[in-house]
Amino acid sequence: MIAGALLPLWSFAWFMSLAVLIDAYAFTFGGVPGTGLSFAYGMLIPAYFSMWVAGRLSKFYLTGEPAGFAVFFGFAMLGTAFCELISSGSFYLWSGNFEPTLSEFLSREFEYAPATFSSSAYWAVAFIVGSVVSHAYQKARALQGLSH
């Protein structure tokens, strides 16, 4: 989300490649069980891309104004919702580890999604606080430059 707001589009491919390399190492040498490796693994690309797109769409609102930060936070939560639905939904449907019923999926979402949303909210708020501090510092420097 934050990277989508700050970095060029080509860096998404770089980050996805890095994630695949880290996962390959973890599955091959790190002792991580391959239960997450299924057709659903490929769905991480659109899942993460939904977060990236949310960041790209929100970047125009990052003007330093409170309303813009609220829009940024809204995009962060919307991107998180799409990412969660794509990643968890595809893993649930295609991993072969679960009985694919709506009630089972929803019970798992109610168990695990709050942690996903709270993590995204934490990082979005941390970014907003950092942006507020940065904007305040830039304004102070500009005013200081005008007074000399």
Descriptions of predicted regions:
Residues 1, 43-51, 123, 127:
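Hydrophobic core segments of transmembrane alpha-helices in multi-pass, intramembrane catalytic enzymes
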Residues 1-15:
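Generic transmembrane alpha-helix motif of multi-pass integral membrane proteins
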Residues 4-7, 51-59, 127-135:
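Hydrophobic transmembrane alpha-helices
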Residues 8, 31, 95-96:
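Short helix-capping/hinge motifs at transmembrane helix termini and TM-loop junctions
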Residues 17-57:
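Interfacial aromatic-anchored transmembrane helix boundaries in multi-pass membrane proteins
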Residues 61-148:
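Membrane-embedded alpha-helical hairpins and interfacial helices in multi-pass inner-membrane proteins
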